[in-house]
Amino acid sequence: MTQLAIGKPAPLGAHYDGQGVNFTLFSAHAERVELCVFDANGQEHRYDLPGHSGDIWHGYLPDARPGLRYGYRVHGPWQPAEGHRFNPAKLLIDPCARQIDGEFKDNPLLHAGHNEPDYRDNAAIAPKCVVVVDHYDWEDDAPPRTPWGSTIIYEAHVKGLTYLHPEIPVEIRGTYKALGHPVMINYLKQLGITALELLPVAQFASEPRLQRMGLSNYWGYNPVAMFALHPAYACSPETALHEFRDAIKALHKAGIEVILDIVLNHSAELDLDGPLFSLRGIDNRSYYWIREDGDYHNWTGCGNTLNLSHPAVVDYASACLRYWVETCHVDGFRFDLAAVMGRTPEFRQDAPLFTAIQNCPVLSQVKLIAEPWDIAPGGYQVGNFPPLFAEWNDHFRDAARRFWLHYDLPLGAFAGRFAASSDVFKRNGRLPSAAINLVTAHDGFTLRDCVCFNHKHNEANGEENRDGTNNNYSNNHGKEGVGGTLDLVERRRDSIHALLTTLLLSQGTPMLLAGDEHGHSQHGNNNAYCQDNQLTWLDWSQASSGLTAFTAALIHLRKRIPALVENRWWEEGDGNVRWLNRYAQPLSTDEWQNGPKQLQILLSDRFLIAINATLEVTEIVLPAGEWHAIPPFAGEDNPVITAVWQGPAHGLCVFQR
């Protein structure tokens, strides 16, 4: 039988060099590591990794070829109280595997034991890693590098975006290929999108609890192989990487960036009763934050928390991010529960992973977006990330909804959020684009549901409606649920228009949730993470063409307003913004705090947003000059020229002079 050569300790993972494959695995506490290779008949062949350089185990298998299936058995102590859970009876996934063969099904053999080890061998049913060869012709691909000030983000799910699209070929709907189809690209271009932000595409597993209920993890925030593409989104698992890169290349040719939502805060191994796939059996003590009793710190709400202050885990995370940029040409990342990235265990701006990203010539040049919180004490870190990062701005989301749907936000607070939340983000040299403004996201109500439901309706999730937030700041306008009288439909439409206008014409980087421009509803489910069905898939046949056109017109209007695209903080007297009352006069201190919800925002001295967020029709006296309403508030050929605007209740309009 072929013996392993010593090989090299870098790079991590399995790499084919034309003559054989080099295998490397980190484990600081292992006593022995076996490489397990499976032939075409499923027969297992085991080899001890002979090289041991520091904490890296390595070996070289001559004559091995791409397509080889493999895994690891890692020997070491079973000492749960000290955080060690080695169990060589269990076949483990290479954390750096580029492709996985097999499914992550709920099976007792995929558990290693809680207090005592489960020594039943699981190789027959455990997923296997696959050695891949990386040859791809990028042609003349180049990153669009859209300036932050011109960026419009569109958050979408690979499957949900295209699965029901009637103009995309049936055989590729819901796949990576569909993202690069001309129909999809033309739609994004016409809408005005500059960056497509995809929910997780790294391979993930459905939690055992969901599988037992007949559900699945739809969103993908349960990662199991961070270097491997999720095969369910590919026409063929073997060609997933090729399909994904084809889509990115096509999007780049259209000037559209691709941002990946990535989960570096926990793994699909969940809590100590969860399955054993990889990290727990390779080096539990190093990869996870471990409590003094040997259990996990659950700062993510998912059972475990990756220890991104450990040098080897920092190297792993950095290598993962570089892989997606260098191999797949992605343009940036949105980091889920990103406060975990800065834990040491307290949150620090100079945490090891932040420092590694800052010092990396590759990662420091791409777009970095943080979801700036986790669920641990001190986990809410909005505004506190290093200067390279932009951050989801939940202050904006809540303020916009409160102002237009709950009517309880003072003008001053609204204006502060409209001006890129400078009280939060104007520090350490950061620019307005650091505020990622959103009204909705995958997590929560859709925009239509914000105006149709007062309460969440998550019964389909199997948790008796306990899951999902109760703080939605929504308003059903008098009737729970979609549909209703013409008057009700019109009032809801006006609220949607007001929220979209606030989002797309405010300072900061706007993020639009896919489907909001259609009027997509999830029928009140504000936590649809386990709904891989028509509740979440965008129904293009039911899309509101009028709302889509309204959204596109707002985006194109935004691109014409210098105050919004120049990415400079507004200063008193700089000509970027003036705040006026209904009489076109500067607001008094009392009006800012206690005045009626009527406001005029003059941008770049030419564009005027007139707002009447009161219950009554109100005359708004426009500033001096000849003003005409502009699309999408008036037609191109018949602009409304006026000096006084009769502002409808809960209405707004944009003028130009």
Curated annotation (Swiss-Prot):
<feature type="active site" description="Nucleophile">
    <location>
        <position position="336"/>
    </location>
</feature>
<dbReference type="InterPro" id="IPR017853">
    <property type="entry name" value="Glycoside_hydrolase_SF"/>
</dbReference>
<comment type="function">
    <text>Removes maltotriose and maltotetraose chains that are attached by 1,6-alpha-linkage to the limit dextrin main chain, generating a debranched limit dextrin.</text>
</comment>
<keyword id="KW-0378">Hydrolase</keyword>
<dbReference type="InterPro" id="IPR013783">
    <property type="entry name" value="Ig-like_fold"/>
</dbReference>
<feature type="region of interest" description="Disordered">
    <location>
        <begin position="460"/>
        <end position="481"/>
    </location>
</feature>
<dbReference type="InterPro" id="IPR006047">
    <property type="entry name" value="Glyco_hydro_13_cat_dom"/>
</dbReference>
<comment type="similarity">
    <text>Belongs to the glycosyl hydrolase 13 family.</text>
</comment>
<feature type="active site" description="Proton donor">
    <location>
        <position position="371"/>
    </location>
</feature>
<dbReference type="Pfam" id="PF00128">
    <property type="entry name" value="Alpha-amylase"/>
</dbReference>
<dbReference type="Pfam" id="PF02922">
    <property type="entry name" value="CBM_48"/>
</dbReference>
<dbReference type="GO" id="GO:0004553">
    <property type="term" value="F:hydrolase activity, hydrolyzing O-glycosyl compounds"/>
</dbReference>
<keyword id="KW-0326">Glycosidase</keyword>
<feature type="site" description="Transition state stabilizer">
    <location>
        <position position="443"/>
    </location>
</feature>
<keyword id="KW-0119">Carbohydrate metabolism</keyword>
<protein>
    <recommendedName>
        <fullName>Glycogen debranching enzyme</fullName>
        <ecNumber>3.2.1.196</ecNumber>
    </recommendedName>
</protein>
<dbReference type="InterPro" id="IPR040784">
    <property type="entry name" value="GlgX_C"/>
</dbReference>
<dbReference type="InterPro" id="IPR044505">
    <property type="entry name" value="GlgX_Isoamylase_N_E_set"/>
</dbReference>
<dbReference type="InterPro" id="IPR022844">
    <property type="entry name" value="Glycogen_debranch_bac"/>
</dbReference>
<dbReference type="Pfam" id="PF18390">
    <property type="entry name" value="GlgX_C"/>
</dbReference>
<dbReference type="InterPro" id="IPR011837">
    <property type="entry name" value="Glycogen_debranch_GlgX"/>
</dbReference>
<dbReference type="GO" id="GO:0005980">
    <property type="term" value="P:glycogen catabolic process"/>
</dbReference>
<comment type="pathway">
    <text>Glycan degradation; glycogen degradation.</text>
</comment>
<dbReference type="GO" id="GO:0004133">
    <property type="term" value="F:glycogen debranching enzyme activity"/>
</dbReference>
<dbReference type="InterPro" id="IPR004193">
    <property type="entry name" value="Glyco_hydro_13_N"/>
</dbReference>
<dbReference type="InterPro" id="IPR014756">
    <property type="entry name" value="Ig_E-set"/>
</dbReference>
<keyword id="KW-0321">Glycogen metabolism</keyword>
<dbReference type="InterPro" id="IPR013780">
    <property type="entry name" value="Glyco_hydro_b"/>
</dbReference>
